[in-house]
Amino acid sequence: LAAYQRKERAGLLIMATGTGKTRTAIALVDVLMKANVVQKALFLADRTSLVNQAHNAFKANLKDASFVNLLEDKNQVGRVYFSTYQTMMGLIDEMNADGTRKFGTGMFDLIIVDEAHRSVYQKFGEIFKYFDSLLVGLTATPRDEVDRDTYALFGLESGVPTDYYDLDQAI
């Protein structure tokens, strides 16, 4: 939240495995929605299993929002959407019957990128360029092992994430 208050539009959170990346994402969406900063959010992951896990966790912990799993229903309307990169790449080109885009550039106020360390940016980076939104990446990869292109995507100096929470802090 401090990064957002400094008018930064992107951030990378590095958290050790099992320390609550998804719970952190849920809390972030909750706070930003309650503050009316975010109306619609998109949670992206590289695998169907991660999308489904996140969808279920959000439903269980964020009672006041409506959810759309785009892997199951591409026509539903809600406040928090879940998708794989591959599915979203196809959807940003889809048109409505009236000729407008199904997902316009301003559709989402916040995009959360799970497993942000993966090499998805060369292939799916257009998603992040297309949407005009806040961008938050989550990864468990130690900060000295995160690719510098990942830091660059979030507008950060190599090796300097927005925040990190390592296993020593968790214990």
Short names for language-model regions:
Residues 1-171:
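RecA-like P-loop NTPase motor core of helicase/translocase proteins
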